[in-house]
């Protein structure tokens, strides 16, 4: 996915 990195560091 694309937002995986986002949700990971959130």
Curated annotation (Swiss-Prot):
Where in the body, by tissue, does this protein show up? Expressed in placenta, specifically the maternal caruncula tissue (MCT) (at protein level).
**GO CC annotations, alphabetized:** extracellular region
Any one GO molecular function term: metal ion binding
Q: Where in the cell is it found?
A: Secreted
Could you tell me which residues carry Phosphoserine? 5
Q: Which residues bind Ca(2+)?
A: 6
Q: Which UniProt keywords apply?
A: Calcium, Lipid-binding, Metal-binding, Phosphoprotein, Secreted, Zinc
Q: What is its main location?
A: secreted
In which domain of life is the source organism classified?
Eukaryota
What does the record note on quaternary structure? Interacts with FCGRT; this interaction regulates ALB homeostasis. Interacts with TASOR. In plasma, occurs in a covalently-linked complex with chromophore-bound alpha-1-microglobulin; this interaction does not prevent fatty acid binding to ALB.
Physiological role: Serum albumin, the main protein of plasma, has a good binding capacity for water, Ca(2+), Na(+), K(+), fatty acids, hormones, bilirubin and drugs. Its main function is the regulation of the colloidal osmotic pressure of blood. Major zinc transporter in plasma, typically binds about 80% of all plasma zinc. Major calcium and magnesium transporter in plasma, binds approximately 45% of circulating calcium and magnesium in plasma. Potentially has more than two calcium-binding sites and might additionally bind calcium in a non-specific manner.
Q: Which family does it belong to?
A: Belongs to the ALB/AFP/VDB family.
Q: What is this protein called?
A: Serum albumin
């Amino acid at each position: 996915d694309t937002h995986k990195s986002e949700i990971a560091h959130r």
